[in-house]
């Protein structure tokens, strides 16, 4: 059973109680994929925060993997790589997708939500995010690591 979680709240509140945020969703899972970082604003607190998050997930799930950020950010990437190495989990770089592919939507493009329903991009903020092709590339990078 896949349980997608949006933990953008954690990215902006790096010292929040992880258990109350994700505990029931990750407990006993075979796999946790940590895919975050772009919304982090406090880069200094991110390094110890991501270490705590990875450690927590490792205690609750059978396997944990983590991706880098879609948007290139060397400081965040170093913190994520450090957490992966410290806790012995796989690190999956994905910033190359943004550099190598035209994978950002434009206003007026049609994308699909998690239920497969189409919607038209109308807001400027969404154009910095990966489009459906970019999301597919991210998913493929994760899946390739899991094989």
Named regions from a protein language model:
Residues 1-47:
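Conserved SGNH/GDSL esterase-like catalytic core that processes O-acyl groups on lipids
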Residues 2-6, 68, 93-95:
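Residue-level recognition of beta-strand->loop/alpha-helix junctions
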Residues 20-24, 52-56, 141, 145:
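A generic secondary-structure signal
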Residues 27-28, 60, 85, 131:
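Residue-level preference for short coil/turn positions at secondary-structure junctions
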Residues 30, 54-58, 114-118:
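Short amphipathic alpha-helical segments, especially helix-boundary/capping motifs
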Residues 33-42, 51-83, 87:
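Active-site segments of SGNH/GDSL-like serine hydrolases
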Residues 46, 50, 135:
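Aromatic/hydrophobic pocket-lining residues that form the small-molecule binding cavity
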Residues 71-147:
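Catalytic His-Asp segment of secreted/periplasmic serine-dependent ester chemistry enzymes
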